[in-house]
């Protein structure tokens, strides 16, 4: 049985530590992995209102403990530092308070870096924390090891108070600048403003603080596209069961179960040492009792959020290990076998050993579709002759050996040729291919099949697949955006990537984009395409980092293979989605729109599929709520060679 969790459970405890050595030992005894505690000593006080806060920054009085209290490996692995919160205000209108706050934060960040702490937790920003962000951004430039965490509540204190007294609805409908009020009171907006001012630095992450009230489901899902590294769970959020032990509401449990699928640490806050173990035991129980990983999820784990360049099937030959991965798919070839069987049964032809049904497998690879076709003929009780057309000379070697091993010599003929160049007098009753990419047509299935369809019987020939459609949707994913940005050049920001997205939030349901049908009987075949699509977002505000692409393919009649979420072929893992990045993230907000019918965000994009004599490429852009430059103009950064 496959383990039930993708990631190990890591849980710490937040406390104000006077004796840090003793508290670490206690935490370990209670099976916590680390403690989260203030960098400055809890007995050290500063007066931020004084023009000079004297000994606070002098060498006469130490503001914290000595680094020699613990060995360096404990500082590096067992402690997350917290900066001061009492009295600190880096955006105060009082210049004295502001200046002293800046000095304090810089001093504590410097000390945390000196200790080699893995992470440092900073206080919650407000909607306008410009100076606070500037100080943090400066520090981020010099931190090579330590990560900076920003504490963000799921629901703002103001909203929690209003919910408690049941005034929230009146508060939102009492007139005035309602949209601005919602934005200013939305913790995601605080986080978004802060990280944008810090240029989305990859070492800056959010720490979510659970609240008794939870925001809407859409707003919770929004955090799945953000760089959340830790979740703090105050004991006040827990309920007590009949046995007197802590438990969480169903809504909190459901959100936690989602978070367990990410590499996130957890922290219990507000408990006394006497009750700490009960909270850890409960959270560990939830983590352990997840559903086991499916074979598909287990296979996908190493590829989560890992960017891969799409294949160039006509320019490059696939390697043996690539074929091997594709051939392990438990769903794809069963569906092909079903499609071929139905097609064989539908053919109005009397077959015999001397006059068999002709099946051409174009792009045969190492033979999985050949096998599916033969198995389908056995099920349909039909005599067939199979031509296996393949351009890769290395795959040809495997294919010829397989024919001998399987005893297919009387059934299968291997054609060592590009399907577009092969000449034969035979005409196929059925043409079978698996030339699809993550976006359907992005591995040149239309161009390949258009070149090969001259071998298909004109009036009665059947193509498998019959048609396929690409789908697209806007997404938010700081992770994917930062992965692309790390390359630091134009080429990578205009390249689509095959990826199994994990740390992302799809902002709307995907919509169909380009469709191709086979055989294509148009007198003049044109595989270039242009479409613009509009999406309606129900979330009040978000950041768009690009688009995620899928495909749905009809092999024959009602037999489909699909990676589109709405009709995904469960268990199939031959294809991951495709990610089209935007060069810069784009902020969406319903507060910026004047919709008459509702306040939902309307986002519109445009996509082009361009074709020349030597290459095929995509171009894309955003059209609303703001216009972005068209990317990959003329295929300057990425194309698929013909």
Swiss-Prot record:
Residues 1-286 are annotated as: TIM barrel. Residues 465-642 are annotated as: Beta barrel. It comes from the Eukaryota. GO terms for biological process: methylation; regulation of DNA-templated transcription; sorocarp development. Residues 477-493 are annotated as: Dimerization. Methylates arginine residues in proteins such as small nuclear ribonucleoproteins or histone H2A/H4. This is Protein arginine N-methyltransferase 5. It comes from Dictyostelium discoideum. The gene is prmt5.
């Amino acid at each position: 049985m496959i383990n039930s969790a993708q990631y190990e459970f890591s849980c710490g405890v937040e406390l104000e530590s006077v004796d840090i050595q003793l508290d670490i030992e206690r935490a370990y005894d209670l099976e916590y992995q680390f403690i989260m505690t203030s960098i400055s000593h809890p007995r050290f006080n500063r007066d931020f209102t004084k023009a000079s806060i004297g000994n606070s920054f002098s060498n006469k009085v130490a503001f914290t403990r000595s680094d020699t209290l613990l060995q360096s490996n404990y500082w590096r692995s067992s402690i997350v530092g917290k900066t001061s919160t009492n009295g600190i205000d880096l955006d105060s209108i009082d210049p004295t308070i502001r200046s002293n706050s800046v000095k304090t934060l810089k001093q504590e960040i410097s000390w945390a870096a000196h200790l080699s702490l893995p992470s440092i937790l900073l206080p919650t920003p407000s909607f306008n924390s410009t100076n606070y962000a500037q100080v943090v951004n400066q520090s981020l430039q010099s931190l090579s090891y330590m990560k900076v965490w920003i504490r963000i509540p799921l629901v703002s204190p103001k909203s929690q108070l209003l919910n408690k007294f049941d005034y929230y609805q009146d508060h939102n409908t009492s007139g005035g600048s309602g949209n601005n009020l919602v934005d200013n009171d939305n913790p995601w907006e605080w986080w978004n403003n802060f990280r944008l001012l810090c240029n989305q630095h990859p070492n800056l992450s959010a720490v979510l603080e659970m609240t008794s009230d939870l925001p809407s489901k859409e707003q919770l899902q929004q955090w799945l596209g953000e760089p959340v590294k830790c979740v703090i769970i105050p004991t006040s959020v827990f309920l007590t069961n009949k046995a007197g032990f802590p438990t969480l509401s169903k809504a909190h449990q459901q959100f936690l179960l989602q978070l367990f699928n990410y590499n996130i640490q957890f922290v219990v806050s507000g408990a006394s040492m006497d009750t700490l173990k009960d909270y850890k035991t409960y959270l560990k129980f939830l983590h352990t009792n997840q559903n086991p990983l499916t074979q598909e999820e287990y296979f996908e784990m190493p590829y989560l959020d890992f960017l891969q360049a799409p294949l160039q099937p006509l320019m490059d030959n696939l390697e043996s290990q690539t074929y091997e991965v594709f051939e392990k798919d438990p769903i794809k070839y069963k569906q092909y076998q079903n499609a071929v069987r139905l097609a064989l049964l539908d053919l109005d032809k009397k077959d015999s050993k001397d006059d068999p049904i002709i099946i051409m497998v174009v792009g045969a690879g190492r033979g999985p579709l050949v096998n599916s076709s033969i198995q389908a003929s056995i099920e349909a009780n039909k005599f067939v002759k199979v031509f296996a057309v393949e351009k890769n000379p290395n795959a040809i070697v495997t294919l010829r050996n397989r024919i001998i091993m399987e005893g297919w010599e009387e059934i299968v003929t291997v054609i060592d040729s590009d399907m577009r160049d092969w000449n034969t007098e035979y005409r196929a009753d059925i043409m079978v291919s698996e030339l699809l990419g993550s976006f359907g047509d992005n591995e040149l299935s239309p161009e390949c099949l258009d070149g090969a369809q001259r071998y298909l019987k004109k009036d009665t020939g059947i193509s498998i697949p019959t048609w396929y459609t690409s789908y697209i949707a806007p997404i938010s994913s700081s992770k994917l955006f930062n992965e692309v940005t790390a390359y630091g050049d134009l080429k990578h920001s205009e390249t689509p990537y095959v990826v199994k997205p994990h740390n992302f939030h799809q902002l709307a349901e995907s919509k169909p984009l380009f469709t191709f049908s086979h055989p294509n009987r148009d007198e003049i075949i044109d595989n270039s395409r242009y479409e613009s699509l509009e999406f309606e977002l129900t979330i009040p505000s978000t950041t768009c980092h690009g688009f995620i692409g899928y495909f749905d393919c009809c092999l024959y009649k009602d037999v489909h293979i699909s990676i589109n979420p709405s009709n995904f072929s469960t268990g199939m893992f031959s294809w991951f989605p495709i990610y089209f990045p935007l060069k810069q993230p784009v902020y969406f907000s319903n507060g910026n729109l004047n919709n008459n019918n509702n306040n939902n965000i309307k986002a519109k994009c445009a996509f082009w599929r361009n074709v020349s004599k030597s290459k095929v490429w995509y171009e894309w852009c955003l059209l609303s709520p703001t216009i972005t430059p068209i990317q990959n103009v003329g295929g300057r950064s990425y194309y698929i060679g013909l």
